[in-house]
């Protein structure tokens, strides 16, 4: 399973990419707004760091507006993938954008039926929101399993991005369920690195080395 980072913070992206663990970035209007900077400039800086897909969101409610935004976004850099919401208007936009060769990531997926419709409309990626389902006592991992089973059985090439990741367990669940990609916040990526037993083991090795290094 590939890992993307879910952020618009340049320093977080730079640090995660330096570790060799991410190959793409997802953003949304909230993440961009948090940085308080020009959107196009942020995207260009991201593209200079990560040579992989960069998801940026269209916010218009209607298909015509989404298409216009998508064309503008995709002109910023060839690695741009346009995030489109899972609505009827979104599906119309995805179909036309696919015909134009503009890649899309259909977001706010909460059912296997939604994922299937998005894929059939021509989405390059679908993003089921694992954490938000868990927040309302539904099974986010089960949704990934269902989508993957349907896509594999029907030879659907759309890639599945496990999104709305809250903690490292969500990443493990997504990997076990067969998701192609998990997009993970910086904080969770850092949590995945550490383990108390790893830290204790390093401390013990250093203590033992200090005892024998001068003998």
UniProtKB/Swiss-Prot annotation:
Which GO biological-process labels does this protein carry?
carbohydrate metabolic process; pentose-phosphate shunt
Pathway per the UniProt entry: Carbohydrate degradation; pentose phosphate pathway; D-glyceraldehyde 3-phosphate and beta-D-fructose 6-phosphate from D-ribose 5-phosphate and D-xylulose 5-phosphate (non-oxidative stage): step 2/3
Database matches in CDD domains: Transaldolase_FSA
Q: What is this protein called?
A: Probable transaldolase
Its EC number(s):
2.2.1.2
* Keyword Zinc-finger assigned: no
Looking up PANTHER family in the UniProt record yields: TRANSALDOLASE
PROSITE patterns listed in its UniProt record: TRANSALDOLASE_1 (PS01054), TRANSALDOLASE_2 (PS00958)
Which keywords are on file for this protein? Cytoplasm, Pentose shunt, Schiff base, Transferase
Chief location = cytoplasm
The first-level EC class reads transferase
Active-site residues? Answer: 83
Q: Which GO terms describe its molecular function?
A: aldehyde-lyase activity; transaldolase activity
The family note in this entry says: Belongs to the transaldolase family. Type 3B subfamily.
